[in-house]
Design a protein with these regions (language model features):
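Peripheral, non-AAA+ core regions of ATP-driven protein-machinery
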Residues: 1-211, 215-221, 324, 460-482
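Basic, amphipathic alpha-helical bundle interface domains used for macromolecular binding and assembly
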Residues: 30-41, 56, 63-73, 283, ...
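Conserved alpha-helical scaffold flanking the Walker A/P-loop in AAA+ ATPase domains
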Residues: 199-201, 257-258, 263, 268-296, ...
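Walker A/P-loop
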Residues: 212-256, 318
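The Walker A (P-loop) glycine that initiates the GxxxxGKT/S ATP-binding motif of P-loop NTPases
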Residues: 214, 278, 300
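Conserved inter-motif catalytic segment of the P-loop NTP-binding fold
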Residues: 238-274, 279-280, 385, 423, ...
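Walker B catalytic acidic pair
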Residues: 293, 299-301, 311
Length: 482
């Protein structure tokens, strides 16, 4: 019977074979199975007995082919159990050829969901298999792959289905994981910070990386956490990409398998390299991949380990994370929008009326964490001063819903007919390259931001004022000391 192992986000075909022969009763699993997979012996034996089926008193050998592919996890349990039951003539062996299976068995025979059911179902579809037996909770994500799920709650139901004695109820139609804009904090709650709000809108419209810098209490984190609320829903293909990643790590909510909203991830600054970029013995996706097609917020940006920050340079450029291990390489998509917040100095007083108390040495060490190459990958850098009391008491700020409409309109314009740069804007850009410390990458990013600003303005042409605003968001001297 067929199932699939996961190598990154790719399904690798695994044929589960069971052989029974006379001899001292025993049960062995061969085929480079890890510990969790080897422990299936106890779960499968208990599950078959709990389903009031006969456990064969034979020498049982289960082979997971191909042998050179490492098999990890408990998702092979259901397939192993059905293969043994077919080998012992308790279910028709011929019916196994038309089905794939994925699921973990409890000791009482219940079928539990496992991560990656969507990826397994996609592998089955490519192999021409139309039916996938799975836990009832996984039926929604299996259906997303374009195959027919066979949702079962218990091994006994799977056996009855294979015998032709029982048909499962059709799985209820899965709903998208919507509602993120309802629960996301509203942009209207942010008082003042006109420049920060403007930069947030530009970042949302053009999918630009954004760095908010300023003293504590100026609303940097508050503003950054409202970015998901002004982002449009994902396109169908984008939603499937995100759902595939979240399926592998088991983060899909039951009943809402399709992630239709851009994901938002905010890891703690103490997070390790594997936690951020992915890794482990598996390996598995990290926060960078879990934020694919969404937002990765790094609050207190300089507090992250420098190797972790530097490791983000590759996915920021290429949109993928490659994790190499002795047994192979796994690649995960990681095309995320990076949003970071930071103080301007270790004590936080720089840029505030209280003033900075840091020594020159301490300030230099603080800035060393932020390499020029990393800062250059931010399209928008905004210094956020402390708002005035009159701004905090004000009202009438724009809501997230209103800003999201403008963001969607700008994105549609960028996709249909991107604005072209005028001769005046081109001359200003040439002058900026000559006078400012602007790298080739920085020049391209300024042009992209100017294009987004023009789209937000409803213009078919990048005017001089659009480019001037884009240049104003480049790296301020207070971040580098130059």
């Amino acid at each position: 019977m067929l199932t699939y192992a996961l190598v990154g986000l790719e399904p690798r075909r695994v044929e589960v074979e069971a052989h029974l022969q006379k001899g001292v009763p025993s049960f062995a699993i061969v085929g480079l199975a890890d510990r969790a997979c080897q422990e299936a012996k106890e779960r499968v034996r208990s599950g078959i007995v709990s389903a009031e089926l006969e456990w064969p008193l034979r020498r049982i050998t289960v082979n997971l082919a191909p042998a050179e592919l490492r098999k990890e996890g408990s998702g092979f349990d259901l397939t192993i159990a059905l293969a043994i039951l077919a080998a012992s003539h308790q279910i028709p062996a011929g019916s196994l050829r038309e089905h794939a299976a994925v699921g973990e068995l409890a000791l009482d025979g219940r079928v539990r969901p496992v991560g990656g059911a969507l990826v397994v179902a996609e592998g089955a579809r490519r192999a021409g298999i139309e039916f996938v037996l799975c836990a009832a909770e996984s039926a929604g994500e299996v259906a997303l792959a374009g195959v027919d799920p066979v949702p079962v709650h218990h091994l006994a139901e799977a056996v009855a289905y294979m015998r032709g004695d029982w048909l499962p109820k059709p799985a209820p139609p899965s709903s998208a994981n919507g509602g993120a804009h309802v629960t996301c904090p509203d942009l209207a709650e942010v008082k003042g910070q006109r420049r920060g709000r403007r930069a947030l809108e530009i970042a949302a419209a053009g999918r630009h990386n954004l760095l908010l810098a300023g003293p504590p209490g100026t609303g940097k984190t508050m503003l950054a956490r409202r970015l998901p609320g002004i982002l449009p829903e994902l396109a169908r293909e984008e939603a499937l990409e995100v759902t595939r990643i979240h399926s592998v790590v088991g983060l899909l909510p039951s009943g809402q398998p399709l992630v239709a909203e851009p994901p938002f991830r905010a890891p703690h600054h103490s997070s390790s390299m594997p936690a951020i970029v992915g890794g482990g013995s598996g390996p598995s996706p990290g926060e960078a991949s879990l934020a694919h097609r969404g937002v990765l917020l790094l609050d207190e940006f300089p507090e992250f380990q420098r190797p972790v920050l530097e490791a983000l340079r590759q996915p920021l450029e290429d949109g993928v994370v490659s994790v190499a291990r002795a047994n192979g390489r796994a690649t995960f998509p990681a095309r995320f929008q990076l949003v970071a917040t930071m103080n301007l100095c270790p004590c936080g007083g720089r840029g505030d009326a209280a003033g900075c108390s840091c020594s020159a040495v301490r300030l230099a060490r603080f800035r060393e964490k932020l390499s020029r190459a990393l800062l250059d990958r931010f399209d928008l850098v905004v210094a956020m001063p402390r708002p005035r009391a009159s701004e905090l008491d004000g009202s009438g700020e724009e809501t997230s819903a209103l800003v999201r409409e403008r963001v969607q309109a700008a994105r549609s314009r960028l996709e249909a007919r991107p604005p072209r740069m005028s001769s005046e804007a081109r001359a200003l850009l040439t002058e900026a390259v000559e006078r400012l410390p602007l790298s080739g990458r920085g020049r391209a990013r300024v042009a992209r931001v100017a294009r987004t600003i023009a789209a937000l303005a409803g213009s078919d042409e990048i005017a001089r004022e659009h480019l001037a605003e884009a240049l104003s968001y480049r790296i301020p001297p207070e971040l580098t000391g130059k």
